[in-house]
Amino acid sequence: IKKFGNEVVITFYPQKRESKVFKEIIQWPTFGGGNSFVKRTLLEKVKFNMAFEFGYGEDADFGMQLRNQGVDILYLPNPEILHLKAPMGGFRTKPVLAWDKDSIQPKPSPTVQLYKILYLSPEQQKGYQMVLFFKYYSKQSFKNPLRYYLNYRKQWNQSVFWANQLKAKS
């Protein structure tokens, strides 16, 4: 942090047999909590949002809070710190989520949707919705486009509902 004059840095954090793609110091678009260094004074202005607990997005949300404070995140290719995977714990034990038993499963995950609601403009959210629609069309059992659209819309609305429930609790 001192050497580069930046308040937040992340380093290369490979798993076994993963090779380095970026070999230069660059401005990094995301934040990963597993191998980041943050100036202590910034930690008084941001926090982990518990609405993201057990889902995807807690690191990205934390990083957006930093970015909204005007902070840049630098990627440092060195030091290289090996990312070891624990044999148990973390996401290896699947938590029971409030929407797990819903007949219509939300798509995307409500925590992903929450991140989009918090940080994207309405136009960007619509764009994301459209990209996701086309991305999953070929992977669904519905080959009739209208039937797929109607089902997708239900799943999307379910995701928005649960994301707003999470948002209300945060």
Model-derived regions: residue spans:
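Catalytic core of nucleotide-sugar-dependent glycosyltransferases
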Residues: F91-G127, K169
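Hydrophobic residues within well-ordered alpha-helices
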Residues: L66-R67
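A recurrent flexible, glycine/aromatic-enriched loop bordering the glycosyltransferase active site
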Residues: V21-V38, L97-S103
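Non-catalytic, C-terminal membrane-associated alpha-helical segments of glycosyltransferases
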Residues: S121-S170
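Acidic donor-binding loop at a coil-to-helix junction in glycosyltransferase catalytic cores
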Residues: G55-F62
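Conserved donor NDP-sugar-binding/catalytic core segment of glycosyltransferases
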Residues: I1-K23
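Short, well-ordered alpha-helical scaffold segment located
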Residues: T41-L43, E80
